[in-house]
Amino acid sequence: MSTKVDIDHLRKWIGKIDNVTDYVTPIVEQRYRATLNMDIGNPKDGDPVTSGLHWMLGWNLVKNDELGVDSHPALGEFLPPVPLPRRMWAGSEIKVLKPIRVGDKVIKQSTVADIQVKEGRTGLLCFVTAEYNFLVNDLSLIHISEPTRLSV
């Protein structure tokens, strides 16, 4: 069975932006440290957060019945509705320009940067590249370029 992908339709998602605001409170930092089995300490406003905490920030609230079969938000809102059954993370390039700090109001700005369809050994592949900027006071502190591979 061959799946058809309308690349012209999918490319309409290029440039789509989604902004989610989050707040780094001391308890957010402590919960992250506890997750990593670290001493939770007593973080104060202005302290740099533990490396990797940005992965916990800026997630959209999605009701259970709005999830796709892979438990991610259903395709077609931010990410295009690629008609392939598997979604895989294909890696990231991360640039930390400045640390996020406890007390920061962080805006995670997500942008669909590119969409490409390719033929692989196992069939059709669609690469959706999203870029994520974590903004504090309109300055990008962390930039992530992340291709996601959807495949048959």
Q: How would you label these PLM feature ranges?
A:
Residues 2-105:
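Hydrophobic, proline/glycine-rich low-complexity stretches
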Residues 87-137:
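Hydrophobic beta-sheet segments that form the core/acyl-binding groove
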Residues 142-152:
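Single conserved hydrophobic/aromatic residue that forms the stacking wall/gate
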